């Protein structure tokens, strides 16, 4: 089975083209593939298929709202093998792969996901690099919109706002947090949060207050741990930072350890613009891949 390896601001993925959705994935196979010692290593896996093929193969029970059979479908799995609704960095890499491989000839097209359709605009593309904007849909503040939820990260307690970006986020902006303190946080330590409020877990962003139109953040993704970037997390961070200033709309640059992205929040949707890099192409050893399925 052929693969590509790519990243969006160092949030890295294994891309598996499987247009007819013929390959059966187990959580153990995905986890092994993403393991940085046992497999190729990645924050997640992007299966490239169509929505219609995914339904026919049983990957989807039904088409997500707004997604048609002919749309491309990003079947995204976290590094632990669990299924995820959406990944903003993953969509950019997914779109880059489609254009660079010749599977898609248009610069503007729809990528389906469990969170619904995502319109992408590929501003530049070559075999190595791409610049992609993703319409991420409306990001919704949950609850009162104020910092109503608490979490302990790296031994430090933060208050945050819950944001739905097609997947759940807890964005914690601390006006007193310095860049040095942000860098020193141990995001590998156990995270303590209210499991009643977030029974399925939540992605957690810790961010500074905006300065000159920029916020800086780190992220702990559910099912993965700390990653160098999280696309939906940068959207959630922008929503939280704007809300702290009493604004519902605006544009911010969000700096993560893996680089910068630009987030625009409007009354009706949100946009994520950033880079994608395809670093490798290869072929998985069938004997290894299918031995993992047999061992489950």
UniProtKB/Swiss-Prot annotation:
The keyword Cell membrane does not apply. The record marks 169, 221 as: Could be important to modulate the pK values of the two catalytic cysteine residues. GO terms for cellular component: cytosol. It is found in: Cytoplasm. It comes from the Bacteria. It catalyses: (2S,6S)-2,6-diaminopimelate = meso-2,6-diaminopimelate. Gene3D superfamilies: Diaminopimelate Epimerase, Chain A, domain 1. The keyword Membrane does not apply. One of its GO terms (molecular function) is diaminopimelate epimerase activity. Its EC number is 5.1.1.7. GO terms for biological process: lysine biosynthetic process via diaminopimelate. InterPro entries: DAP_epimerase_AS (IPR018510), DAP_epimerase_DapF (IPR001653). Substrate binds at residues 11, 78, 88-89, 167, 203, 221-222, 231-232. Pathway: Amino-acid biosynthesis; L-lysine biosynthesis via DAP pathway; DL-2,6-diaminopimelate from LL-2,6-diaminopimelate: step 1/1. Pfam families: DAP_epimerase (PF01678). The active site is at 87 (proton donor), 230 (proton acceptor). Keywords: Amino-acid biosynthesis, Cytoplasm, Isomerase, Lysine biosynthesis. NCBIfam families: DapF. Catalyzes the stereoinversion of LL-2,6-diaminopimelate (L,L-DAP) to meso-diaminopimelate (meso-DAP), a precursor of L-lysine and an essential component of the bacterial peptidoglycan. Homodimer. Belongs to the diaminopimelate epimerase family. This is Diaminopimelate epimerase. It comes from Mycobacterium leprae (strain TN).
